[in-house]
């Protein structure tokens, strides 16, 4: 395949594959050539704000959440009557721009899971799922844990109610014998679509850290998704963090191979990749509605685990996914949609500890405090999900 055809294929896939795109929508174009070791202060997202914007912008956009919600109390207070809740009778706004891995709420709606619980939902397109929760533009969404944790620590008023699924992203290199593990990436560059300090960056350094690689021995660069394969082939990049869906055809044609994975590696495959996040005020003021919403999504995810092809068809029928159907089914099958609440809580604890040790978040942040403030399954246990 000549270079022109490869570029055309890359561009076509960038347009057609929509899974997990929200992880990188916040990236600023001027950061595209950013390159720095992980220890650089600019990579410390505890000093940044939501989604790579400056602190003043985040404070304005989140209604000064960073100050007002430092001690947010997510304890559910309720009369026990859903009719008494201020949002009762109004649709729950769900931030969803389409995609496979964030599709459970849409499938839940099509299957009538919200309606049978007396709920109505409204799906809204947003530029940033994190900001939509922080500003209460949306009541609920699904987003990557790696992306949500740092801004939540910095003040975004989010409650994590359950895991969405496992897997979805991996570390890729060219399919040759030059690099076969993370050791081979020392003194080289890993690229990703997200900005420096984004979920992609954080995933990369967790892979390296788990393998005993000093994260400062590798450099990191933001590269447009459509240009990453070409950057690997030209030698500009030695490795890349990509969604498994986007990478699949390049694996099939022998261009790249996977050397580290959230989906398939023993030390990551049971972790929740994405999280069902709700606005903290919505949960406090409407605990019964929030619980029913979480229940509907969790029961849908359990159904999806056993009915992958039908679930994928629903996404395609509603224009929430496109591209090659069989590839989409394969990707959906690679996720564990029935990830447990217990494993999701453990994932949050592990991520907090890793981020503290790596300097991604303030070292004073306690995983117990974070769990107490931001993890709330709303009274639902794993045994409740049918």
Predicted regions located by residue number:
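Pocket-lining segment of extracytoplasmic ligand-binding domains
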Residues: 146, 221, 226-317
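Sec-dependent signal peptide recognition
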Residues: 2-10
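C-terminal motif of bacterial Sec signal peptides marking the signal peptidase cleavage site
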Residues: 18-19
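Short, glycine-/small- and polar/acidic-enriched structural segments
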Residues: 65-222, 238-244, 255-261, 270
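Periplasmic-binding protein-like
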Residues: 164-175, 256-283, 333-335, 368-382
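N-terminal, intrinsically disordered, polar/charged segments of Gram-positive cell-envelope systems
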Residues: 24-88, 148
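Conserved C-terminal helix/tail region of periplasmic/extracytoplasmic solute-binding proteins
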Residues: 73, 353-386
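Secondary-structure end/capping motifs
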Residues: 284-362
């Amino acid at each position: 395949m000549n270079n022109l055809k490869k570029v055309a294929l890359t561009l076509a896939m960038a347009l057609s594959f929509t899974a997990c795109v929200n992880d990188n929508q916040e990236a600023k174009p001027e950061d595209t050539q950013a390159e720095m070791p992980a220890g650089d202060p600019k990579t410390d997202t505890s000093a940044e704000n939501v989604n790579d914007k400056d602190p003043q912008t985040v404070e304005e956009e989140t209604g000064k959440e960073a100050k007002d919600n430092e001690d947010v109390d997510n304890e559910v207070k309720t009369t026990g009557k859903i009719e008494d809740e201020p949002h009762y009778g109004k649709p729950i706004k769900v931030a969803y721009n389409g995609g496979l891995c964030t599709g459970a709420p849409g499938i839940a709606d099509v299957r009538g899971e919200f309606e049978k619980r007396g709920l109505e939902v409204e799906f809204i397109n947003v530029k940033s799922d994190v900001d939509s929760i922080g500003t209460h533009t949306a009541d609920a969404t699904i987003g990557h844990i790696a992306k949500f944790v740092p801004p939540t620590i910095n003040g975004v008023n989010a409650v994590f109610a359950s895991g969405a699924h496992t897997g979805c992203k991996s570390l890729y290199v060219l399919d040759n014998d030059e690099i076969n593990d993370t050791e081979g990436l020392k003194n080289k560059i890993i690229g990703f679509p997200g900005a420096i300090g984004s979920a992609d960056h954080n995933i990369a350094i967790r892979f390296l850290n788990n393998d005993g690689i000093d994260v400062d021995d590798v450099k990191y660069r933001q590269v447009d998704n459509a240009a990453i394969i070409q950057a690997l082939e030209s030698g500009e990049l030695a490795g890349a963090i990509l969604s498994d869906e986007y990478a699949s055809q390049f694996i099939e044609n022998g261009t790249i191979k996977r050397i580290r994975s959230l989906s398939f590696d023993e030390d990551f495959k049971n972790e929740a990749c994405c999280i069902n996040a709700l606005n903290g005020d919505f949960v406090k003021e409407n605990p019964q509605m929030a619980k029913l919403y979480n229940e509907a999504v969790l029961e849908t995810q359990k159904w999806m685990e056993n009915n992958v092809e039908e679930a994928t068809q629903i996404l395609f029928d509603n224009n929430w996914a496109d591209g090659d159907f069989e590839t989409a089914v394969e990707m959906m099958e690679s996720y564990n949609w029935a990830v447990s609440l217990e494993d999701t809580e453990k994932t949050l604890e592990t991520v907090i500890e890793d981020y503290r040790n790596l300097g991604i978040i303030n070292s004073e942040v306690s995983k117990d405090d974070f769990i107490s403030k931001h993890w709330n399954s709303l009274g639902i246990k794993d045994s409740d999900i049918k």
